[in-house]
């Protein structure tokens, strides 16, 4: 049996931009993607801590070291710059494998979105 489990999470990142005029997606600093074990094109689930919105989109790679977290297109209507969001991705895996699987969870610096080591 296959089940869907949390694979990666960027916990409490700060939204830096909301760009309504770009077609869909979330742009994420490449440093955060690497640290969280996420890739461009990957489906992600976003939870906005400020307003309770929850939605899905896909990742676009942002400039490394920029701290960029930008919601694009229709998703830009669901957030405001400076909102705090949780970005999660999931993976399908065998039930037995899932029992011992440990997701990658990162906690970016709240002011800069830089990776905290």
Curated annotation (Swiss-Prot):
CDD domains in UniProt: Asp_decarbox
GO BP annotations listed: alanine biosynthetic process; pantothenate biosynthetic process
Binding residue positions for substrate: 57, 73-75
Source species: Bacteroides thetaiotaomicron (strain ATCC 29148 / DSM 2079 / JCM 5827 / CCUG 10774 / NCTC 10582 / VPI-5482 / E50)
Cofactor note: Binds 1 pyruvoyl group covalently per subunit.
Pathway the protein takes part in: Cofactor biosynthesis; (R)-pantothenate biosynthesis; beta-alanine from L-aspartate: step 1/1
Catalysis performed (reactions): L-aspartate + H(+) = beta-alanine + CO2
Primary location class: cytoplasm
Alphabetically ordered keywords of this record: Autocatalytic cleavage, Cytoplasm, Decarboxylase, Lyase, Pantothenate biosynthesis, Pyruvate, Schiff base, Zymogen
Subunit field text: Heterooctamer of four alpha and four beta subunits.
Free-text function comment from the UniProt entry: Catalyzes the pyruvoyl-dependent decarboxylation of aspartate to produce beta-alanine.
Protein name: Aspartate 1-decarboxylase
Pfam families, sorted: Asp_decarbox
Similarity comment text for this entry: Belongs to the PanD family.
């Amino acid at each position: 049996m296959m089940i869907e489990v949390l694979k990666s999470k960027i916990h409490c990142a700060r939204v830096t931009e909301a760009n309504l005029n770009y077609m869909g997606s979330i742009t994420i600093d490449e440093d955060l993607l690497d640290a969280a074990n996420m890739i461009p094109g990957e489906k992600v689930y976003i939870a906005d801590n400020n307003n309770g919105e929850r939605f899905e989109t896909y990742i676009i790679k942002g400039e490394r070291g920029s701290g960029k977290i930008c919601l694009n297109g229709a998703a830009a209507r669901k957030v405001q710059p400076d909102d705090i969001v949780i970005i999660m991705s999931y993976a399908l895996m065998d039930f037995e494998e899932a029992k011992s699987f440990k997701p990658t969870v990162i906690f970016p610096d709240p002011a800069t979105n830089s990776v905290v080591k």
